[in-house]
């Protein structure tokens, strides 16, 4: 299981339930990386999806204690249920939001992090993998600039 996220300089991932700065390069990387995989997502993140519809070309698992069903999603009420469902999957990505990242990070062996260097005030955060002794930056896959905003797409592995 791996995590995929875009973070700002303070490792923030969002504000008021949305991603304040979204880069097309990050979205493209996300689509290419998760296509054909199983993705685990939280209810608040799904609320930000267009039409609250599942991501096409993926098996969509919704981790929610309040929702029991949502068309196109397999709904799990707890982490253990989601872990059981993904045991046989070839590729599993945790795609957010903050609560889902925190609950599933201990089960992840790797992470793809797009570092977006934009002046953003976040209210939701991902743990700082650079400061975590259990994680190691193993590669910078891409660097660039979009609309004056610098970014890097990085690969982390659990030690």
Regions found by a protein language model. Give the residues of each.
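Enzymes that bind and transform nitrogen-containing heteroaromatic metabolites
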Residues: 1-159
């Amino acid at each position: 299981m791996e995590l995929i996220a875009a973070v700002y300089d303070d490792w923030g991932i969002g504000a008021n339930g949305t991603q304040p700065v979204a880069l097309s390069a990050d979205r493209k990387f996300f689509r290419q990386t998760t296509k054909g995989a199983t993705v685990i997502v939280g209810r608040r993140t799904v609320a930000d999806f267009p039409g609250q519809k599942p991501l096409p070309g993926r098996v969509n698992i919704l981790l929610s204690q309040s929702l029991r069903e949502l068309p196109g999603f397999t709904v799990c009420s707890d982490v253990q249920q989601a872990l059981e469902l993904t045991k046989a999957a070839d590729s599993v990505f945790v795609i957010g939001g903050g609560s889902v990242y925190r609950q599933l990070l201990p089960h992840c062996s790797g992470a793809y992090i797009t570092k977006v260097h934009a002046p953003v005030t976040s209210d939701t955060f991902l743990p700082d993998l650079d400061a975590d002794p259990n994680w190691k930056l193993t590669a910078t896959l891409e660097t660039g600039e979009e609309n004056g905003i610098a970014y890097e797409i990085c690969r982390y592995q659990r030690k």
